Amino acid sequence: MADPGTMLYITADELEERFGSKKTEKLARESEYAFLQKVTDIAYEAAWNREIKAVFISGPTSSGKTTTSTRLGSAIHLYGRPTLTISLDDYYKEGDYDYDEDGRPDMESITTLDIDLMVTQFRQLLRGEEVILPRFDFGTRTRSFPEERRASIAQNAVMIVEGLHGLSDEVIGELPQDECMGVFLCPWASLVGDRTLLRPEQIRQLRRISRDHSHRQTGALATLDYWPI
């Protein structure tokens, strides 16, 4: 059953009360604990349902999908089932971008992904077959199939797939439904004062600026141009 969660509203006064060298650290620990508890609950559900062979993690850009998939994989492994983590980002098509009506490169549409290759490899993995997973280079927009990316999943293993379109009909909808579990996540909090000061999408935007700079060779202005406030 889907659990949509509840929007968390934090006032500027409440946040200010929790600032300080010791208070801020405590707030971070409490937030991390709540996050890990939710991940552990999902891991328990996936690990003890032996029909589940794949968990698909989806959500809007910069929601924490990669971090969550890593933590979830570790938690499932602790319950005795090995995992294989796959990022849909490695299935981008090679070559130039498509552009939207404003002339900005489109990296959000599902048409930018090689769905045929993706679904074919996922089906093979769920059948216990071996594949060579792709690796996409965002700097050169090229895709390779290095030998060290050869992979398979054991009979009791769980495949963890993270990406923007992981829960789309074109992806998870093409796979055996009784073997797949879906997880949708998104920062779901607002900072409020006399008015809303920081919305969930702005939190994600700050995360994306940091990620694009570190992992996609993209500056902050380019990110803001692509994803304006």
Label each PLM-derived region with a short phrase.
Residues V55-I57:
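Hydrophobic anchor at the beta1->P-loop junction of P-loop NTPases
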